Amino acid sequence: MKLKQRVVLLAILLVIFIFTKVFLIDNLDTSAANREDQRAFHRMMTGLRVELAPKLDHTLQSPWEIAAQWVVPREVYPEETPELGAVMHAMATKKIIKADVGYKGTQLKALLILEGGQKVVFKPKRYSRDHVVEGEPYAGYDRHNAEVAAFHLDRILGFHRAPLVVGRFVNLRTEIKPVATEQLLSTFLTVGNNTCFYGKCYYCRETEPACADGDIMEGSVTLWLPDVWPLQKHRHPWGRTYREGKLARWEYDESYCDAVKKTSPYDSGPRLLDIIDTAVFDYLIGNADRHHYESFQDDEGASMLILLDNAKSFGNPSLDERSILAPLYQCCIIRVSTWNRLNYLKNGVLKSALKSAMAHDPISPVLSDPHLDAVDQRLLSVLATVKQCTDQFGMDTVLVEDRMPLSHL
């Protein structure tokens, strides 16, 4: 063989060798990441059922101090939380020492302070479990049970970006009225034999109060985030106009994601991928009302998108509002870890996991079976949407590796 031919052959072999090494290394990295995702999934499934128990083992701290220490820029609570049941038990049972009207917003809520000084948001029951909310996908009152279910879905998806939520029964006559501010107390009334209140908010009306069953009111309690983590509000780039006949740009411009990618904080960092995660989360729960979102202040785009205010969910199990997935199908990217978790949850696993996670909540059953079935069905639509993206652009473009370290943040 001539020298020139040998050189060419050696060059070809060298290129093949390099590509083989790169391919194998990439495959090993991906396999290692997949194995870690699988281990995380098994850890989640093992600790899924949270039994509300008062005892805190091996600590002199209050449940409120423990929950406050969990918060970091990319998580509200960690993956493994042996004290979770004790914290949620405290949320569901601790004495209410003050009750006031809710913070800003359009929907009825009350701001409670529990023994030990912990703030929580109380959202009252407005509908029975089998009630179907008709109309626009964002129609109706807030659903307290949706807050509970959304928190547990956040756990199951491995996001850890939703504040803790638990169901609670309160006696309006003996637990709320004696410690209520004058502003809240002035909104109480009696309808038949039931104690009711209508609070203070944009849509709150005396003609539309929330009523207890006698004096006992069912609701949800959301743990207030620590004051050392002030929030910053952002307009959601895929928010709706809420005006009849007026479309938002994303509703008619299929290249809208390209414009979003050129604006801060979506041009770098994790925020755009958080938007995609949130679109998946909101689609599964049927929440078409995320017009704004919160992150921690002064985060320069590094903070997570916090999954607050999920009560406009689980309204109609027969309605799958595909437009909620617009960030996903317009950007055609998703985290590898999210994609892996979604695949682990198919074939009925998601429904079973969600039902199991909520089994010990004080207001269980939290969701009706049609809503649980709907979550499973919507998961298939999410997977199909990602498949369409990978068919069009390829796996390497669509699936993004973005595992951010948490402990040092």
From Swiss-Prot:
Question: Is the keyword Transmembrane assigned to this protein?
Answer: yes
Q: What are the catalytic residues?
A: 289
Q: Which cofactor does it need?
A: Mn(2+)
Q: Which cysteines bridge via disulfide bonds?
A: 196-211, 201-204, 257-331, 332-389
CDD domains membership: FAM20B_C
Arranged from A to Z, the UniProt key words for this protein are: ATP-binding, Disulfide bond, Glycoprotein, Golgi apparatus, Kinase, Manganese, Membrane, Metal-binding, Nucleotide-binding, Signal-anchor, Transferase, Transmembrane, Transmembrane helix
Write out the catalysed reaction.
Answer: 3-O-(beta-D-galactosyl-(1->3)-beta-D-galactosyl-(1->4)-beta-D-xylosyl)-L-seryl-[protein] + ATP = 3-O-(beta-D-galactosyl-(1->3)-beta-D-galactosyl-(1->4)-beta-D-2-O-phosphoxylosyl)-L-seryl-[protein] + ADP + H(+)
Outline which residue ranges sit on the Lumenal face.
26-409
Q: Membrane topology per the record? A: Single-pass type II membrane protein
Concerning InterPro entries, the annotation shows:
FAM20, FAM20_C
The enzyme's E.C. designation = 2.7.1.-
Membrane-spanning segments: 7-25
Enzyme class label: transferase
Describe the family membership recorded for this protein in Swiss-Prot or TrEMBL: Belongs to the FAM20 family.
By what name is this protein known?
A: Glycosaminoglycan xylosylkinase
Q: Which organism is it from?
A: Homo sapiens
What is the primary gene name for this protein?
A: FAM20B
